[in-house]
Amino acid sequence: MPKSKTHSGTAKRFKVSGSGKILRQKAGRRHLLEHKATKVTRRLDGVAVVSKADTPRIKRLLDI
């Protein structure tokens, strides 16, 4: 059976931490920020851990 390829779109959006958790950026902070409160944009800063339910699918796409 041939090797499965890494899904390039997934590889750009997610990364694996040292402990094996899958990390992602929070959505909603790219544009149209004028009407959003500073508090909201700060909350959307940083990384988040992918939920347990989505982890197997992401791992399969990343070929882990």
From Swiss-Prot:
GO BP annotations, alphabetical order: translation
Transmembrane parts of this sequence: none
GO MF annotations in UniProt: structural constituent of ribosome
Renumbered residue ranges of the record's region Disordered: 1-23
Claim: Ribonucleoprotein is one of the keywords in the record: yes
Signal peptide segment: none
Basic residues: compositionally biased ranges: 1-15
One of the Pfam families matching this protein, by short name: Ribosomal_L35p
GO CC terms of this entry: cytosolic large ribosomal subunit
Keyword entries, A-Z: Ribonucleoprotein, Ribosomal protein
InterPro entries cross-referenced by the UniProt entry: Ribosomal_bL35 (IPR001706), Ribosomal_bL35-like (IPR021137), Ribosomal_bL35_sf (IPR037229)
NCBIfam families: rpmI_bact
Family indicated by similarity: Belongs to the bacterial ribosomal protein bL35 family.
PANTHER family: 54S RIBOSOMAL PROTEIN BL35M (PTHR33343), LARGE RIBOSOMAL SUBUNIT PROTEIN BL35M (PTHR33343:SF1)
Protein's UniProt name: Large ribosomal subunit protein bL35
The species this protein was found in: Rhodococcus opacus (strain B4)
Underlying gene: rpmI
